């Protein structure tokens, strides 16, 4: 058995006029390759499709209508902590002893990007806040409780 010890060098077609394309007339137009791109994929290139792109044709699943898909409006606990004094001034938040109560579902939060559906755990909480919201992340609840506040589900 012959063992090739030296790696075969790739053929660069130096000095060749047509680089393996047959006659110089053959490379003209798209007829030489059976059409451009995906042309003929439902006809003469069908075997290529079923071998290399088996899922290319046909429908699978469905797309939900955009008006049904609703991304939750979120805010970080750090942002609430930073806004707390301003919200107290505007009468959106209330003081309950040493705690500040903020209802993030309040329509009056529109100038601040609200009302919010979910409270996330980003940022630092330096004072006790009682936050009322439909949803919280675990980290948000941890941070609020560490600062002496609480998370209330709306």
From Swiss-Prot:
Residues 1-30 have a biased composition (Basic residues). Pfam families: Ribosomal_L27A. It comes from the Archaea. Gene3D superfamilies: 3.100.10.10, 4.10.990.10. GO terms for molecular function: rRNA binding; structural constituent of ribosome. GO terms for cellular component: cytosolic large ribosomal subunit. Residues 1-41 are annotated as: Disordered. GO terms for biological process: translation. Keywords: Ribonucleoprotein, Ribosomal protein, RNA-binding, rRNA-binding. Belongs to the universal ribosomal protein uL15 family. Binds to the 23S rRNA. HAMAP family: Ribosomal_uL15 (MF_01341). Part of the 50S ribosomal subunit. This is Large ribosomal subunit protein uL15. The lineage of its organism: Archaea, Methanobacteriati, Methanobacteriota, Methanomada group, Methanopyri. The gene is rpl15.
């Amino acid at each position: 058995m012959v063992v090739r010890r030296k790696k075969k060098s790739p053929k660069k077609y130096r000095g060749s006029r047509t680089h393996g394309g047959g006659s110089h007339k053959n490379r003209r137009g798209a007829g030489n390759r059976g059409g451009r791109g995906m042309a003929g994929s439902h006809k003469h290139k069908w075997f290529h499709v079923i071998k290399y792109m088996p899922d290319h044709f046909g429908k699978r699943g469905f797309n939900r209508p955009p008006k049904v898909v609703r991304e939750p409006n979120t805010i970080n606990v750090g942002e609430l902590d930073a806004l707390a004094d301003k919200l107290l001034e505007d009468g959106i938040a209330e003081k309950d002893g040493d705690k500040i109560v903020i209802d993030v579902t309040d329509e009056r939060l529109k100038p601040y990007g609200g009302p919010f559906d979910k409270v996330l755990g980003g940022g630092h909480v330096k004072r006790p806040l009682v936050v009322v919201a439909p949803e919280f992340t675990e980290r948000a609840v941890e941070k609020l409780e560490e600062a002496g506040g609480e998370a209330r589900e709306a």
